[in-house]
Amino acid sequence: MIKKFDKKDEESGSGSNPFQHLEKSAVLQEARIFNETPINPRRCLHILTKILYLLNQGEHFGTMEATEAFFAMTRLFQSNDQTLRRMCYLTIKEMATISEDVIIVTSSLTKDMTGKEDVYRGPAIRALCRITDGTMLQAVERYMKQAIVDKVSSVASSALVSSLHMMKISYDVVKRWINEAQEAASSDNIMVQYHALGVLYHLRKNDRLAVSKMLNKFTKSGLKSQFAYCMLIRIASRLLKESEDGHESPLFDFIESCLRNKHEMVIYEAASAIIHLPNCTARELAPAVSVLQLFCSSPKPALRYAAVRTLNKVAMKHPSAVTACNLDLENLITDSNRSIATLAITTLLKTGSESSVDRLMKQISSFVSEISDEFKVVVVQAISALCHKYPRKHSVMMTFLSNMLRDDGGFEYKKAIVDCIISIVEENPESKEAGLAHLCEFIEDCEHTVLATKILHLLGKEGPRTPVPSKYIRFIFNRVVLENEAVRAAAVSALAKFGAQNESLLPSILVLLQRCMMDTDDEVRDRATFYLNVLQQRQMALNATYIFNGLTVSIPGMEKALHQYTLEPSEKPFDMKSIPLAMAPVFEQKSEITLVTPKPEKLAPSRQDIFQEQLAAIPEFMNLGPLFKSSEPVQLTEAETEYFVRCVKHMFTDHIVFQFDCTNTLNDQLLEKVTVQMEPSDSYEVLCCIPAPSLPYNQPGICYTLVRLPDEDPTAVAGTFSCTMKFTVRDCDPNTGVPDEDGYDDEYVLEDLEVTVSDHIQKILKPNFAAAWEEVGDAFEKEETFALSSTKTLEEAVNNIITFLGMQPCERSDKVPENKNSHSLYLAGVYRGGYDLLVRSRLALADGVTMQVTVRSKERTPVDVILASVG
């Protein structure tokens, strides 16, 4: 009885998988049966299945043991059992990369590939191409060409799919099969036509003109395969995204015509392609949306799901285009498939009116606990978008989100809710206290370190400015008592911010920080000691520098500079100005990296760090000092011209390095000694040009021009440069790429390049602008008033000022409240050379906009530059 029970228990539990407890050594021992005569197909099949199972489970096979098993398996070709033979093909494909001398089966596979048994031919082709390398491919080329045009569809498809894989090994050989692939593309079999189109596209994808011709041919002649139509639509949409013709192109007409295809798959692919095209207008979207609207009432759940998911994406950018589908979407709210119902509601949240929000939120509440975390995140994202659209509904959203926060769920789900509440708190001052209260409640029982530290950071930033800041201290100090080291350290930093901004709370905060100095963790003790000493000085400037605003430098850059400093001992103190500035605030960099991977990882170098390293490797630029700022690329040629050139401006303390990324788009020319000659205006001085040695067809190259900034007038920071690309041309054969021996000099005029005031200023966020304003002081303060007569709204004025100066808006002052006639804009940045620069701009709307600008810095030059450029 006991034995019977054990067996039954084993079958119902983990023992239900017959291969679960396989041992590699035992299976390899069993494989010796392959050498027995006569062959037992049933037993051999079972052993091959075990080998494939082990390989797919990630079991490591040594080269010797894999080769031994492989050679034993080759004897099974003597059997005529169909199932066993096809299992051999599978095993060959799996063991091709781990066994030696696999080419021993080439003759057997070639025999099967050209034999009369159609059931063997397709799998034999796939197995043969898996073991073939570039040197052997020519030996089977004749057979492959025949197979591609074979009348048996499974053989032709196998040959075409294998050709796609062989392109990675020997593109030139496969290119010779293009005529056969074109013949296969006219096949009546839907899969053969689809695979043939795939081969033709991949052979031509680097030649835009050839792809366009292919598309033109197939769109005119038509196709039998719905799969091939889907692929054509994808190719056409890819070309459309790169094209300048946009939606006037015949390609767009082709995609639109596919909306009337008889196959639902093709109709959906066309609708999806139109929706994902950039810069689509509501009128161009209308036919695609109409098709998706019909799919919403389809009896097939897959079609309903596809339609509502795609409409959900459209609603993000074009909510008005989806409004016509609202009735159909409302019918889907009660769909038996919860995924469809969720997407329907979230789409309605994006397209519905303010009055429908309460009703929709009530409907979501009824089933939100039944859906997966993935769809809960979609709901939260929709609510977040709704908060931006209808800020007055924040209280309804906040209540709903706080209830969701209490439910069970994974990290991504909780993170989405926390991010949404944080954005509501930051966008709506009246919701601040309610949002902070919900987050305080959440961190009392939060198992995610990343979220706890993020919330503590927010409490430190927003809590001190609330009417009763003391009520948050208990929640923060509880973290010091109850949590892990990372959360305790974040809590100490948050406490310090309360002490720095609230004089009445300072004595209590000092006591709490003294307790934190007894912590078991070094980081927590160090932070507590540091903040305690700073706060005891009771100086606003110190608080601003070391508590509110923190580091504004690149972390990888600082790590490298400190390492270099330790390698070369010096009596001079370490200079923080030698480190490139961070492109984003340090805390944002940190949180983003941490959210991606919970494990501590090294910060990835930023774009600016990479540029710094590249420029430092060039001898002429070694002594320019730290890279201050790199601009976004500026295009200096039209897209379809002979040469494509764009420029990145690298700003140093006293110099600018212009980096020209050049591409030669002519296949009958090789350019050599490529430089860009610059004629500056005013007092800029061109020091040297570093050429790109050669520019072969379609291969990008880089040349540089070094320019010294004006000495006499430091405020003359803006200027225009005329640019001419000079080079030596060597004509070459377009087919072989071999250039002529002799060349001739030529030049190409580029568009003018402007250096603006924003190129000299790096954005830096000051979380507490008032403290930073006091810290900089009024030693070099200047104030002027300007009339912006051509500007009609405060929003336009704010956007123009931010864009022109290239500075970072602080305290969310880039958002202008509704129905206001005046507004204050706070901007922060660092001027070239490492000088903090703050701008306070008071705007008033009357006949145009009047602007009073106050500028502060610790040096005179940045202040003069700002006022001179604005004036």
Curated annotation (Swiss-Prot):
Similarity remark: Belongs to the COPG family.
Organism (species): Mus musculus
Protein name: Coatomer subunit gamma-2
Assembly and oligomerization: Oligomeric complex. Binds to CDC42. Interacts with JAGN1. Interacts with TMED10 (via cytoplasmic domain).
Keyword Phosphoprotein: yes
Modification Phosphothreonine occurs at: 594
GO biological process, one term: intra-Golgi vesicle-mediated transport
HEAT repeat extents: 64-101, 283-320, 321-355, 356-392, 395-430, 467-504
Basic and acidic residues bias spans: 1-11
Keyword Membrane found: yes
Membrane topology: Peripheral membrane protein
Function: The coatomer is a cytosolic protein complex that binds to dilysine motifs and reversibly associates with Golgi non-clathrin-coated vesicles, which further mediate biosynthetic protein transport from the ER, via the Golgi up to the trans Golgi network. Coatomer complex is required for budding from Golgi membranes, and is essential for the retrograde Golgi-to-ER transport of dilysine-tagged proteins.
Entry-linked Gene3D superfamilies: Coatomer, gamma subunit, appendage domain, Leucine-rich Repeat Variant, TATA-Binding Protein
GO cellular component: COPI vesicle coat; COPI-coated vesicle; cytosol; Golgi membrane; growth cone
Gene Ontology molecular function: any one: structural molecule activity
InterPro entries cross-referenced by the UniProt entry: ARM-like (IPR011989), ARM-type_fold (IPR016024), Clathrin/coatomer_adapt-like_N (IPR002553), Clathrin_app_Ig-like_sf (IPR013041), Coatomer/calthrin_app_sub_C (IPR009028), Coatomer_g_Cpla (IPR032154), Coatomer_gsu (IPR017106), Coatomer_gsu_app_Ig-like_dom (IPR013040)
